[in-house]
Amino acid sequence: MKVKFLGSFFEEFPPPDYPEVVFVGRSNVGKSSLLNMVVGSKVAKVSKTPGRTRAVNYFLLDKKLYLVDVPGYGYAKVGREEMEKWRKMMERYFKERKDNIKMAFLLIDAVAGVQPLDEQMIEWFEYYGIPFTVVITKIDKASQSEIAKTLKQVKRYVGDGAIVLSSAKEGKGKKELLSRILN
């Protein structure tokens, strides 16, 4: 698998020459880590500090697909003005690219569970007709009861087939995610 970083975009996005797979979720849910795990190399910058990803980052996979790492929503160590700027950028991204998005991976932390902003994101995907899969992340850090609780929450919104359990640290879920990306 060959992955090339195309750049960080704030205003204009790359031409919609390839279908897009976008990684979406709350700040610090593991979007960049998951992207790195899926492609097998550290192409996306990772940080323990919420809000590290501040632009829409595009990666070209095998010259046939864009992988898109977007800023997280919710808590981040930035001011309200910066958060509002991100919100507008994300809204513009989804409105402009909705027809180009092949799949959105909505990442939900196994310990934190479904939060109100996650519910809003699901509603947004449904409104815009964007296909999505919920990826329950950081299962290596969660107890079985926390995972079960989060699974139960997620199943209220999506069927069993639209859920992947993952751990970027342990490589869990990679096969299922690659299958959804490449097919």
Curated annotation (Swiss-Prot):
PROSITE patterns for the chain: G_ENGB
Keyword GTP-binding: yes
Molecular function per GO: GTP binding; metal ion binding
Keywords: Cell cycle, Cell division, GTP-binding, Magnesium, Metal-binding, Nucleotide-binding, Septation
GO CC annotations on file: cytosol
SUPFAM superfamilies: P-loop containing nucleoside triphosphate hydrolases
GO biological process per UniProt: division septum assembly
Residues noted as binding GTP in the record, renumbered to the chain: 25-32, 51-55, 69-72, 137-140, 166-168
Pfam families for this protein: MMR_HSR1
All residue ranges annotated as the EngB-type G domain in the record: 17-183
Required cofactor names: Mg(2+)
HAMAP family, per database record: GTPase_EngB
Function: Necessary for normal cell division and for the maintenance of normal septation.
NCBIfam families in alphabetical order: GTPase_YsxC, small_GTP
The family this protein is said to belong to: Belongs to the TRAFAC class TrmE-Era-EngA-EngB-Septin-like GTPase superfamily. EngB GTPase family.
Name of the protein: Probable GTP-binding protein EngB
